[in-house]
């Protein structure tokens, strides 16, 4: 917000045009654009359509205008809506640096801002302005400037009582005004004229910033500026409670398809909304979009890089083709209904070549694909009950909706996610600690870490989930990561080891759960080639692909340099090629060997109690 007072206050001269000592140009002609607004709207943003308008936030200093405007801008951009925020403090450092706070200066301040906002809106952006703009006539003039250009203008009164604004008083301006050090301070000795008929009133003393943003978004949706699907909620596929009895009765009478554990894990992924906006297993159109473009394209560009499919044998197809619905059975229990099924050919070699970049049958997930049925089945999924595995870890299996609520309860203003399938060593911790530090430096006050181990199928030589969770708990107990600002939860997806293709899936799933930032390190979702032993994917490509991937617009990728053990400093550190001799790369193979043999890793590699958990697992494995 702009400084709302001045040590030198001029007499109010009214709201007429000011000469400002400048000669008015008369030899100018308005030049019409060759590009129409509709045509411009087709290429601005990721969703198409002209959305130009101005959202004019007005209110007292400390009411929350800047906070709401910045959060609104972030929300819109994250959902593919182009926008720009004009803030009072920022404008007064450049365009309006020659203006003070007298009534006539305020009038000119608002006029210039309105003209600039009109240009942004005409360019197809949602322009958000954050200014005290205390006078009704000045705000009305701003509206007329937009209406004269046939551009929507939404006045939003950010309403907080004066005593609340004084309590907030981050800059200490109210205190100075009360002491007489600032004259003409709005709300103290200069009048603020409340809007008489704003499009929206935000009560910031009663609503948090997310609620305020949602109210503005709903206004923009009502006025057809923002499409409704631009802010879709998590799409869960559980049958509503009031329809559950009927659905279960229906499921008992339907023909059925047996599914395995990995299928069931994908059912959970879909049911909990991780693959939003999918309404079930992919139909052929969705499958082809995913396979060829790594995205869903109907309703906007939505990143979804891995096929989420259900397979069937030739016998299953002959039995079920033509049915309008059938039940899915897992371990003797009917867990879901697939309605309006669509059968299409499972071209396994083509799928593997595109998803993994190899058809090597020794790759563990490719091996599973090659052994699956020759048909894929898409359809609308209705899951009957919440899925529990009864392994002592269900309390960590938080859905995207539950995670969002958890972050809200923690008053998080930034959520950064870290996906892992291995035990946490201090190199991982370095990435997470550094991200937390960077976010604080960028002005976030309560960044929260989502430590999100993968909980679905993994290959045989990976550490089982139960032991990984014990190890993660030890890392938190030792204070390597801050338990007060960390949420540990389990991501239910199977692990596909698909490198840059797979890491896009990992990233977008955390996006659905409310993450704003995603940490990516070396060789994410990669593995050695099962036959040559060399890296199947170039270790740097995962991070590079994420920074370019379409449809990952609601979060920011945080790529990091490689972390390795610094022998001189005796701790994990970022690798420096100029001091290569100081560094040691401790591979997973070596780590497992040390643990199996009861040896300790180098000092500073991993928290001691966390290493003890790992050693205990490998000892138990030796005895098995």
Swiss-Prot record:
<feature type="binding site">
    <location>
        <position position="563"/>
    </location>
    <ligand>
        <name>ATP 2</name>
    </ligand>
</feature>
<comment type="pathway">
    <text>Sulfur metabolism; sulfate assimilation.</text>
</comment>
<dbReference type="GO" id="GO:0000103">
    <property type="term" value="P:sulfate assimilation"/>
</dbReference>
<feature type="binding site">
    <location>
        <begin position="521"/>
        <end position="525"/>
    </location>
    <ligand>
        <name>ATP 2</name>
    </ligand>
</feature>
<feature type="binding site">
    <location>
        <position position="171"/>
    </location>
    <ligand>
        <name>adenosine 5'-phosphosulfate</name>
    </ligand>
</feature>
<comment type="function">
    <text>Bifunctional enzyme with both ATP sulfurylase and APS kinase activity, which mediates two steps in the sulfate activation pathway. The first step is the transfer of a sulfate group to ATP to yield adenosine 5'-phosphosulfate (APS), and the second step is the transfer of a phosphate group from ATP to APS yielding 3'-phosphoadenylylsulfate (PAPS: activated sulfate donor used by sulfotransferase). In mammals, PAPS is the sole source of sulfate; APS appears to be only an intermediate in the sulfate-activation pathway.</text>
</comment>
<feature type="binding site">
    <location>
        <begin position="184"/>
        <end position="185"/>
    </location>
    <ligand>
        <name>adenosine 5'-phosphosulfate</name>
    </ligand>
</feature>
<feature type="binding site">
    <location>
        <position position="207"/>
    </location>
    <ligand>
        <name>ATP 1</name>
    </ligand>
</feature>
<keyword id="KW-0548">Nucleotidyltransferase</keyword>
<feature type="binding site">
    <location>
        <begin position="419"/>
        <end position="422"/>
    </location>
    <ligand>
        <name>ATP 2</name>
    </ligand>
</feature>
<feature type="binding site">
    <location>
        <position position="212"/>
    </location>
    <ligand>
        <name>ATP 1</name>
    </ligand>
</feature>
<dbReference type="Pfam" id="PF01583">
    <property type="entry name" value="APS_kinase"/>
</dbReference>
<comment type="subunit">
    <text>Homodimer.</text>
</comment>
<dbReference type="InterPro" id="IPR002650">
    <property type="entry name" value="Sulphate_adenylyltransferase"/>
</dbReference>
<feature type="region of interest" description="Adenylyl-sulfate kinase">
    <location>
        <begin position="1"/>
        <end position="225"/>
    </location>
</feature>
<comment type="similarity">
    <text>In the N-terminal section; belongs to the APS kinase family.</text>
</comment>
<keyword id="KW-0418">Kinase</keyword>
<dbReference type="InterPro" id="IPR002891">
    <property type="entry name" value="APS_kinase"/>
</dbReference>
<feature type="binding site">
    <location>
        <begin position="62"/>
        <end position="67"/>
    </location>
    <ligand>
        <name>ATP 1</name>
    </ligand>
</feature>
<protein>
    <recommendedName>
        <fullName>Bifunctional 3'-phosphoadenosine 5'-phosphosulfate synthase 1</fullName>
        <ecNumber>2.7.7.4</ecNumber>
        <ecNumber>2.7.1.25</ecNumber>
    </recommendedName>
</protein>
<keyword id="KW-0511">Multifunctional enzyme</keyword>
<dbReference type="GO" id="GO:0016779">
    <property type="term" value="F:nucleotidyltransferase activity"/>
</dbReference>
<feature type="binding site">
    <location>
        <position position="101"/>
    </location>
    <ligand>
        <name>adenosine 5'-phosphosulfate</name>
    </ligand>
</feature>
<keyword id="KW-0808">Transferase</keyword>
<dbReference type="GO" id="GO:0050428">
    <property type="term" value="P:3'-phosphoadenosine 5'-phosphosulfate biosynthetic process"/>
</dbReference>
<dbReference type="GO" id="GO:0004781">
    <property type="term" value="F:sulfate adenylyltransferase (ATP) activity"/>
</dbReference>
<feature type="region of interest" description="Sulfate adenylyltransferase">
    <location>
        <begin position="234"/>
        <end position="624"/>
    </location>
</feature>
<comment type="similarity">
    <text>In the C-terminal section; belongs to the sulfate adenylyltransferase family.</text>
</comment>
<keyword id="KW-0007">Acetylation</keyword>
<dbReference type="InterPro" id="IPR015947">
    <property type="entry name" value="PUA-like_sf"/>
</dbReference>
<dbReference type="InterPro" id="IPR024951">
    <property type="entry name" value="Sulfurylase_cat_dom"/>
</dbReference>
<feature type="modified residue" description="N-acetylmethionine">
    <location>
        <position position="1"/>
    </location>
</feature>
<dbReference type="Pfam" id="PF01747">
    <property type="entry name" value="ATP-sulfurylase"/>
</dbReference>
<dbReference type="InterPro" id="IPR025980">
    <property type="entry name" value="ATP-Sase_PUA-like_dom"/>
</dbReference>
<keyword id="KW-0067">ATP-binding</keyword>
<keyword id="KW-0547">Nucleotide-binding</keyword>
<feature type="binding site">
    <location>
        <begin position="132"/>
        <end position="133"/>
    </location>
    <ligand>
        <name>adenosine 5'-phosphosulfate</name>
    </ligand>
</feature>
<dbReference type="GO" id="GO:0005524">
    <property type="term" value="F:ATP binding"/>
</dbReference>
<feature type="binding site">
    <location>
        <begin position="89"/>
        <end position="92"/>
    </location>
    <ligand>
        <name>adenosine 5'-phosphosulfate</name>
    </ligand>
</feature>
<dbReference type="Pfam" id="PF14306">
    <property type="entry name" value="PUA_2"/>
</dbReference>
<feature type="binding site">
    <location>
        <begin position="106"/>
        <end position="109"/>
    </location>
    <ligand>
        <name>adenosine 5'-phosphosulfate</name>
    </ligand>
</feature>
<dbReference type="GO" id="GO:0004020">
    <property type="term" value="F:adenylylsulfate kinase activity"/>
</dbReference>
């Amino acid at each position: 917000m702009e400084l709302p007072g001045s040590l030198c206050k001029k007499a109010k001269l009214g709201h007429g045009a000011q000469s400002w000592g400048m000669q008015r140009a008369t030899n100018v002609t308005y030049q019409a654009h060759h590009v129409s607004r509709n045509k411009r709207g087709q290429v601005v943003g990721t969703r198409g359509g002209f959305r130009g308008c101005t959202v004019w936030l007005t209110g007292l200093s400390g009411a929350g205008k800047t906070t709401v405007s910045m959060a609104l801008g972030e929300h819109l951009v994250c959902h593919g809506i182009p926008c720009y925020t004009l803030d009072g403090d920022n404008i007064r450092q450049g365009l309006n640096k020659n203006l003070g706070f007298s009534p006539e200066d305020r009038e000119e301040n608002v006029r210039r801002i309105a003209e600039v906002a009109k240009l942004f809106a005409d360019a197809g952006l949602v322009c958000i302005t954050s200014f005290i703009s205390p006078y009704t006539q000045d705000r009305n003039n701003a509206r007329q400037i937009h209406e004269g250009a046939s551009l929507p203008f939404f006045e939003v009164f950010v309403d907080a009582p004066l005593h609340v604004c004084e309590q907030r008083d981050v800059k200490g301006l109210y205190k100075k005004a009360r002491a007489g050090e600032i004259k003409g301070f709005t709300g103290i000795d200069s009048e603020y004229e409340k809007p008489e008929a704003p499009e929206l009133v935000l009560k910031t003393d009663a609503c948090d910033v997310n609620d305020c943003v949602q109210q503005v978004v709903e206004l923009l949706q009502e006025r057809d500026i923002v499409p409704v699907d631009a802010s879709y909620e998590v799409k869960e596929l559980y049958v509503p409670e009031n329809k559950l009895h009927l659905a279960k009765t229906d499921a008992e009478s339907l023909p059925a398809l047996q599914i395995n554990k990995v299928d069931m894990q994908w059912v959970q992924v879909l049911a909990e909304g991780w693959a939003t906006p999918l309404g079930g297993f992919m139909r052929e159109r969705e499958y082809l979009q995913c396979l060829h473009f790594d995205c869903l394209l109907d309703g906007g560009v939505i990143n979804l890089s891995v096929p989420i499919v259900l397979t069937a044998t030739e016998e299953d197809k002959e039995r079920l083709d033509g049915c309008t619905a059938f039940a899915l059975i897992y371990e003797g229990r009917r867990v879901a209904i697939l309605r309006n099924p669509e059968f299409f050919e499972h071209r396994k070699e083509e799928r593997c070549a595109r998803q993994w970049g190899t058809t090597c049958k020794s790759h563990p997930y490719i091996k599973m694909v090659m052994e699956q049925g020759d048909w894929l089945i898409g359809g609308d999924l209705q899951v009957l009950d919440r899925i529990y595995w009864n392994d002592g870890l269900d309390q960590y299996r938080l859905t995207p909706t539950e995670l969002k609520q958890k972050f809200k309860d923690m008053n998080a203003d930034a959520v950064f996610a870290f996906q892992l399938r291995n035990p946490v060593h201090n190199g991982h911790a370095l990435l997470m600690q550094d991200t937390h530090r960077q976010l604080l430096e960028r002005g976030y006050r309560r960044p929260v870490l989502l430590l999100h181990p993968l909980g679905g199928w993994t290959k045989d030589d990976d550490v089982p989930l139960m032991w990984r969770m014990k190890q993660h708990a030890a890392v938190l107990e030792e204070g390597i990561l801050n338990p007060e600002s960390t949420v540990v939860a389990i991501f239910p997806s199977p692990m596909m080891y698909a490198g840059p293709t797979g890491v896009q899936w990992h990233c977008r799933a955390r996006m659905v759960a409310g993450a704003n930032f995603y940490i990516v390190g070396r060789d994410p979702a990669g593995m050695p080639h099962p036959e040559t032993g060399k890296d199947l994917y170039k270790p740097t490509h995962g991070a590079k692909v994420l920074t370019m991937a379409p449809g990952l617009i609601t979060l920011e990728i945080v790529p990091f340099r490689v972390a390795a053990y610094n022998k001189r400093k005796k701790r994990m550190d970022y690798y420096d090629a100029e001091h290569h001799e100081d560094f040691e790369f401790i591979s997973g193979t070596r780590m497992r060997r040390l643990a199996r043999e009861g040896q300790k890793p180098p000092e500073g590699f991993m928290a001691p109690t966390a290493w003890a958990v790992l050693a205990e697992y490998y000892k138990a494995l030796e005895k098995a």
